[in-house]
Amino acid sequence: MHSDELLVEVLVEELPAQALLNEYKEMPKKLHALFQKRALEVGNIEVFYTPRRLCLFVKDFPLLTQETKEEFFGPPVKIACNNQDKTQGLNALGLGFYQKLGLKDHQHFQTAFKSNKEVLYHAKIHAKQPTKDLIMPIVLEFLEGLNFGKSMRWGNVEKSFIRPIHNICVLFNGENFNDIEIKEYGFKTKQATKAHRQEGFDFIEVDSPKAYFEVLEKNHVILDPKKREAKILQEIKGLEKKHDIIVEVDRDLLDEVVAITEYPTALLGEFDKAFLKLPSEIITTSMKENQRYFAIFNQKSQEESPTLHNGFIVVSNAISKDKQKIILGNQKVLKARLSDAVFFYENDLKKPLDNAPLESVVFVQGLGTLKDKMERESIIAQYLTQKYISSLSMPLEKALELISRAIQIAKADLLSEVVYEFSELQGIMGYYYALKQNENELVALSVKEQYLPASENAPLPSSVFSSIVALSLKIDSLFSLFSVGKIPSGSKDPFALRRLSFGLLKIIAHYGLEFDLKADLKNLFEKVGVYQSFDLEVLEKFLLERFHNLIDCNLSIIRSVLNTNERDIVKIIQKVKALKRFLDNPKNAQKKELLFSAFKRLANINKDRNPNESSGFSTSLFKELQEHALFEAFNAIKTSTFESLDSKIEAYFGLHAPLEEYFKSVLVMDKDIEIQKNRKNFLWGVYQSFLEIGDIKEIAI
């Protein structure tokens, strides 16, 4: 037998769900790295968790490590040997190399070739060794390498961990792993585990992985999170069918309840229907954030949208036959929460949105108050309203009035009691308060949708009107934060500016709005006129980098368009997609290869060209037929009107033949300086025209 089952359980106090979930997906990768480091060939590693334990299981764990060879390369023979001759022995430098390796025999040294040089060489062979001696060091290094964000110390232990560790149980090949002192965490190991808390607190001895799994199963611990999830979903499905309801299974919430339970049971509770007078988002948010309950909706016909039901699903970790007692306890807690919500909501309704003291709340240190932000957004919104009036289906005067009103009240709900309690309801509560105070419905909806999209694949504002409000917020935030140097770097993005920028691009692309990242940003920056000065090209570049997430396309095609002077967002996307269509067409395979080759030569000729240099040329100085042929083909394109971008790209790629012939027959660097300059200027014009569709030399397919 060359392998056996390995099981390691780390018994801990209750792990915080979110920290555990964030790190869980990295655990197999980290274990693989530790095994490889010690020459262990390990196949599939299964990692399980409950709130009280981390468990790793390997079906075929080797009994011995592999034999490995460790190579050491020293200085070149020429400088490591006496008189640069290896037959005359080592000098001080050569001896030093072997002494560092702890070797005493220097007489029979070896050499090898590295980077075409003969160098001193030594190989150490590491023999196979029993893996049982490596398991505990690997486990301890694994625990130390886990990153949960925060950690704690307890007692007099040397190391910290997210929660106190009570035991490490190792089961492998019948070996004894009892009473190993783990000084780092202050305990001695036991080959034992613990049951569900309600089954008892004592250790239960186990002598094999099989026995371990059986003990947990008998004692109400479902070790595999996938099985706990399946149990929850199956029970929810049963409740849906029995009570003719729809349960909203929120993915994040499901992951969380799986992480906080060892033996989950889904139960149906209810609350007083009187609470349904609250906006549904208050109820569902309170249930999810405070109590980890799943919301329930009434079953409706396909034509009707489901409405919130006065029920909820609680996932209990308790082992009890008296389910009603658990349900009643949760109903009592929820009633108190919703009573508070009613109090907050009714208090908010008494306060006119106009009276919100925005001047009392700082937006960001150094960037004024919410009132200052509102005033900046108002100027941006006026500019965008005038720019997009043809998409608003109303007179300009009316549009400006409504947009101005929307901006004026957009931030008022940030000072409400409900949003103070549930910050994720910002905008949503503003919508409800606006409707209650008889604001125009477009205005109210734009307040709700100003923060959209909330994530990469989330819904966008539902109209151009709402989009103007959302864009104004985003543009001001970018200008403001960039102006005080709060620019994302590395993985740090505390103000979520990457997401905000992506949302800006996505809105503009979705509605086909004209927006030039150079001209419009400059105009808006100057129009608002209160931002601290900074290089707008930094912001422009930051926004251009987001296109790689916006368009599903070969990155080199995106780069080819971004390398041109095109800065209109919609036109950039159109050009990228048109180039992709052309290049993906099998009929164009040969044509594109020929053009890539010719265009790279064209680009090389012009790489050091000063864009401001005079570029005039005269056909009277053309001497070769191929010059005239290329000019005629090029001029035909320049003077044509194309029905579509696709046909324009087709025409430009058709220049591959005359370009090839030109480069075969025409010497650009003619001895006659006037002819040479004329040819360079002509090719510069051809090159610049190509940039109307993309910088072809960037494309790598």
Curated annotation (Swiss-Prot):
Question: What GO terms in the biological process aspect are recorded for it?
Answer: glycyl-tRNA aminoacylation
Q: Which GO terms describe its molecular function?
A: ATP binding; glycine-tRNA ligase activity
Q: Which reaction does it catalyse?
A: tRNA(Gly) + glycine + ATP = glycyl-tRNA(Gly) + AMP + diphosphate
Top-rank taxon, per record: Bacteria
Judged by the first EC level, this protein's enzyme class is: ligase
**Presence of keyword Nucleotide-binding:** yes
- Enzyme Commission number: 6.1.1.14
Question: Which positions are tagged coiled coil?
Answer: none
| InterPro entries found in the cross-reference section | Gly-tRNA-synth_bsu, Gly-tRNA-synth_heterodimer
Main location per the UniProt record: cytoplasm
Q: How does it assemble?
A: Tetramer of two alpha and two beta subunits.
Would you identify the family this protein belongs to, as annotated?
Answer: Belongs to the class-II aminoacyl-tRNA synthetase family.
Q: What is this protein called?
A: Glycine--tRNA ligase beta subunit
Which source organism?
A: Helicobacter pylori (strain J99 / ATCC 700824) (Campylobacter pylori J99)
Classification from the root reads: Bacteria, Pseudomonadati, Campylobacterota, Epsilonproteobacteria, Campylobacterales
